[in-house]
Amino acid sequence: MKYLEKHPMIMIVIGILGISMSAILVRFSSAPSAVTAAWRLCWTVLLQTPVVFGKVQFRRELMSVNRKTALLSVVSGVFLALHFFLWFESLQHTTVASSTIIVCTEVIWVSLGFWLFLKGKLSGKAVAAIAVAFLGSVMIALADSGMGGSHLYGDLLALLAAITVAVYMLIGRIVRSGVSTTVYTYLVYTACAAVLLVMCLVQGQSMVAYGMQTVLIGLLLALFSTILGHSVFSWCLKYFSPSFVSASKLCEPVVSATMAAFLFGEIPGALQLAGGVLILGSVFYYARLEDK
């Protein structure tokens, strides 16, 4: 661990590879989106449980969580469940590049929500970044419109996935002031897993009807995308600025799209690439503004 503390860039690279695997693994799943997402969250909760209950500090904190924090964590888990379902479903209808790029606009939606509901400030430069990101999304939609209605539907699902994860992030800003990251994420992931299991039940989908491949994909998503992805980036905040960590996450669409090009033959067109550059550039610019 001391070696990694001296060379934290290694963890940045691991984090990028971890989150970039998510879209690819989802594509390999033959199960419905709700089932794949449910397995990911069930494995995540299972892997996190020994950490939470194995440490007295976290165990005591979990048992002393007040009603407001618990309720907000459940609501946050509902929106996170919607995010996973919508994004996984999006990947069944549009390209990996389009889906991952559009989901990256979550930062923009967080800023809008912060301004609208939490009385945050939104500068003129931030508004310009949002406008450019919107233009990029329109360009991707135009590029995908030539591929058929299913691709546009996938783009819309990715946009809704970005908005729902933004709500999850906004609730986190409120709750995190009174609870540790470990306990908060455990509460949210547990609620998220429960919601996804209910979705499977309502849709009449069995968790065990799609073979061991789906179970394994869920485990790999939990390990790579959650633990070696998002959790690693949280660790990196100790050594890098928030803007650098945010900018590093923007490598996800690039790496995912590159893997999709080799694995699925998905080669982005010129308009799609241009829209992607506008979105990623505007999100990077906004992340720099946030850091200042």
Tell me what each language-model feature is.
Residues 30, 93, 119-121, 178, ...:
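Helix-loop interface residues and adjacent transmembrane-helix termini in multi-pass membrane transporters
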Residues 17-21, 25, 51, 74-93, ...:
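Hydrophobic alpha-helical transmembrane segments of multi-pass membrane transport proteins
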Residues 20, 45-46, 134, 190-194, ...:
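Small-residue-rich packing faces within the transmembrane alpha-helices of Major Facilitator Superfamily
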Residues 51-52, 106-128, 254-274:
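C-terminal transmembrane-helix exit sites in multi-pass transporters
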Residues 1-39, 44, 78, 86, ...:
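Glycine-/small-residue-enriched transmembrane alpha-helix faces in small-molecule transporters
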Residues 36, 181-185, 245:
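Juxtamembrane helix-start motifs in multi-pass secondary transporters
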Residues 48, 74, 122-144, 162, ...:
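Hydrophobic transmembrane alpha-helices of multi-pass small-molecule transport proteins
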Residues 1-17, 45-75, 88, 121-127, ...:
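Membrane-interface interhelical linkers
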